[in-house]
């Protein structure tokens, strides 16, 4: 490799989403604080400016993300990108529904491609060098790492994987390391413009659906200013399944002015497909490499607060690299421990996910919703589950409280008589 001892520490980041941009910003901020020379190169082939590429995430952001950005990255939260404020949720079962309001600040709905572009531009302004190229292969050596691209190769000291669920990047990483990407759910996203009056009548709630359909784990309708975003997720959801979802009576009743979809905007009801992790990746760090965000599977069940987790893990990887090192032992001792808030809650979240799916498909969810109308603690648990504002450990505590269990049992018994 063509590197010398006098060269600054060179960190290469694969991926320019929030995780990669946050990691680059954190590296430069921390390096300035400890007066260490670093070079950060970020590889991203997508063009976020001009919205030439899209992110299939629904795009609802909430605390603690604004404070995290401003405190840890010195980057103001882009409130000017706000398309709508989300004040609560409406949970739909098969026949029942429940409005859920929390005490926290409203969440912010925005276009994810605009947020991603803002973060990447902020990183560039601070000194991150962005190479508009796609990584194609890599090599690890005792004295560094080489990333081959569809442009020129890049040599560095340590590699940060921030490529989300990109299967090509995961494949070449898996060939040269023991990395195994997280298991994934697929999603289909669409949108349409209902008109100003219909949007005002729709309100500021996200409508969350837990249908009986065996292939759909959850769906949602999210207001975004002058349009609504609709998404479904499951092991293998596809376009026909989205069309079926849109025909369900409970969904159709919630959709504002659906009959005018496509009449005012030719792009209405175009379907976009994506993937997101539903488990922790295996071997997501090693000598000279570490995964962050979706690439590591470091997210909550139901993908709540995915951007917050991406930014958090990007910052934590930067702290490990500059304060401890970039060996496998350094990442194991520091980076993994720093993410214990996410890792430790995963088993609770996975169990909650399976229980919710069982209740929805067995018809029990309606009884739980009826019980929550009367029991505040159960209602608080449901809000925490759909909003992502509470750890799943806390949600289980509220769900299994005697008052919650009594209310659920009473609702089930009334259903059977």
Whereabouts are the PLM-identified features?
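Beta1/beta-strand and adjacent pyrophosphate-binding region of the FAD-binding site
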Residues: 2-19, 41
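Glycine-rich FAD pyrophosphate-binding loop
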Residues: 14, 28-54
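Predominantly flavin-linked oxidoreductase catalytic cores and closely associated redox partners
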Residues: 26-29, 122-258, 280, 297
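N-terminal FAD cofactor-binding segment of flavoenzymes
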Residues: 45-90
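Short beta-strand to alpha-helix junction loop
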Residues: 59-63, 101-122, 168, 190, ...
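FAD/FMN-dependent oxidoreductases across multiple families
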Residues: 82, 137, 238-321, 326
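Helix-loop-beta segment of a Rossmann-like dinucleotide-binding subdomain
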Residues: 94-111, 146, 223-234
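C-terminal helical "tail/cap" subdomain of flavin- and related membrane-associated enzymes
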Residues: 322-417
